[in-house]
């Protein structure tokens, strides 16, 4: 389906969605295809193609370096969300100019990375809304049944919620700041199909963070009710939204709200309430893989991955966006752009012999960047490494944190150990709960999810907590690592972080809205400190 108009008005990043085909074919084996307005929702087969187009927007998207649209760089979820999430934190180190602005916090309202993230997230949201309207109309025309429509809608609602939450994380203050009373983002639920829709949409102001979270939960609740527990095969059950994916994402969203009762309630649905031992979800059959490599080496067929964004050889973020290209070492034909911080790698809580250190990190001993690199994404030749959005280990650690805050240390410890003990030597396993169980859970998250883009989410939600950093932490600079090389990566070594921290009160803790949006939409209020 093509949207056949172009708007001169910037509507919350929807210029991309308004000017491009909104239905694309994106399957594991097929390239992009276009569908006309008249046929997009005229058959079940075409509806499937239209839905694949929504996933294509999530996985590949478009990119505008300031000179016009180009092929995608994996915005928003085909790599960019992971890369930006890591570069906003301190556990991975930017080595070259590619991510320097994000890493050092010098972004402005016209910086390409944050502008494109905003625009492509809203492009995804609009395509989800267009799809929802299309399948609702298809019921009235007798093309599909109401149950079939609901199942399709569930996938679009999941992606809409995921996209809005990503926007809130980067462009808004955390929920913990005055219980979400700060400026949120416009929560778009109506398809932008023509100029009247654009005019109506412009009238919508930002609202509050709390309002956004309420709508995210509403979308996920509906998605849970509509979606099946599994798809026709395992690859589709991982790469398409399912009931388990909606529940799992709710554990994350509720954790950002510090709504621990609901984190636990959702975690229980996925089997996080048994006493100890091997946890298995009654929905989807999720469980931890015995080998920490399996979710990454068998990305389309494992029991731990709940939802990932699929990439193919034909359609991916390219050399400038695909996660394998951006995170890998030159020894594997990667670009040496991002190294693991020695201050994480050497931390006493990341013990020697941990399989996530020996199997999922690579020590590069040659070339100009003798450092440690992430080794989760290995499909560098064809760039089809899938991007993990949520794994079962996150559900367990989300629920562990909630139990710890509710005073059930026994269950929190059991969940923590389930994730940790599969990776560390038996001699390094906890026999009794650490004196600060919450801290141990936070440290475990840094190890388990390094290279998966979750560091920023934790820094954001915990900014005002005693366990947080009260802003963006100080960071190690590339020059410090190139000087010392692998001597930096030794037990006990702490490299002084010379890039100054950004206090929570500084405007740069959150990104500015794109200047093009604020200038074109008088109702869209810019974040404080960035002007209008």
Predicted regions and their residues:
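Inward-facing hydrophobic residues that define packing positions of alpha-helical scaffold repeats
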Residues: 51, 125-128, 213, 220, ...
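Conserved, well-structured interaction surfaces
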Residues: 94-172, 207, 220, 224-228, ...
């Amino acid at each position: 389906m093509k949207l056949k108009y172009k708007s001169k008005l910037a509507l919350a990043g929807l210029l991309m969605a308004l000017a491009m085909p909104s239905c694309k074919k994106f399957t594991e084996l097929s390239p992009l295809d276009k569908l006309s307005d008249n046929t997009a929702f005229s058959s079940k087969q075409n509806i499937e193609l239209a839905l694949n187009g929504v996933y294509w927007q999530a996985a590949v998207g478009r990119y505008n370096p300031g000179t016009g649209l180009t092929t995608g760089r994996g915005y928003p979820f085909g790599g960019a969300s992971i890369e930006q999430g890591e570069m906003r934190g301190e556990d991975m180190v930017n080595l070259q100019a590619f991510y320097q602005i994000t890493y050092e916090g010098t972004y402005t309202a016209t910086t390409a990375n944050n502008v494109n993230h905003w625009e492509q997230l809203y492009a995804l949201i609009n395509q989800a809304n267009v799809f929802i309207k299309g399948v609702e109309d298809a019921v009235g025309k007798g093309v599909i049944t109401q149950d079939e429509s609901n199942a399709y809608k569930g996938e679009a609602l999941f992606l809409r919620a995921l996209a809005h939450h990503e926007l809130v994380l980067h462009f808004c203050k955390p929920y913990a700041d005055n219980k979400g009373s700060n400026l949120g983002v416009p929560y778009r639920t109506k398809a932008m199909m023509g100029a009247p829709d654009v005019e109506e949409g412009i009238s919508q102001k930002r609202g509050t963070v709390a309002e956004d979270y309420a709508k995210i939960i509403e979308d996920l609740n509906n998605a849970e009710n509509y979606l099946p527990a599994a798809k026709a095969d395992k690859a589709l059950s991982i790469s398409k939204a399912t009931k388990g994916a909606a529940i799992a994402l709710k554990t994350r969203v509720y954790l950002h709200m510090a709504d621990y009762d609901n984190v636990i309630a959702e975690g229980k649905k996925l089997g996080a309430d048994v006493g100890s031992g091997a946890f298995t979800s009654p929905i989807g059959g999720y469980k931890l893989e015995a080998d920490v490599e399996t979710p990454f080496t068998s990305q389309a067929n494992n029991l731990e991955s709940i939802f990932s964004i699929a990439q193919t050889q034909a359609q991916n973020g390219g050399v400038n966006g695909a996660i394998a290209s951006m995170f890998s070492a030159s020894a594997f034909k990667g670009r040496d752009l991002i190294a693991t911080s020695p201050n994480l790698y050497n931390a006493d809580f990341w013990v020697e012999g941990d399989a996530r250190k020996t199997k999922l990190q690579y020590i590069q001993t040659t070339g100009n960047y003798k450092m440690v690199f992430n080794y989760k994404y290995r499909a560098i030749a064809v760039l089809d490494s899938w991007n993990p959005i949520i794994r079962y280990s996150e559900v367990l650690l989300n629920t562990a944190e909630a139990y710890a805050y509710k005073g059930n240390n026994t269950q929190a410890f059991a969940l923590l150990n389930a994730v940790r003990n599969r990776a560390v030597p038996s001699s390094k396993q906890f026999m009794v709960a650490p004196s600060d169980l919450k801290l141990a859970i936070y440290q475990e998250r840094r190890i388990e999810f390094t290279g998966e883009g979750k560091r920023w989410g934790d820094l954001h939600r915990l900014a005002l907590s005693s366990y947080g950093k009260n802003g963006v932490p100080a960071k190690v600079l590339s020059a410090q690592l190139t000087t010392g090389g692998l001597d930096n990566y030794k037990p006990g070594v702490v490299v002084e972080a010379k890039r100054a921290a950004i206090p929570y009160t500084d405007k740069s803790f959150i990104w500015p809205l794109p200047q093009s949006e604020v200038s074109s939409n008088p109702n869209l209020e810019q974040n404080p400190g960035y002007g209008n």
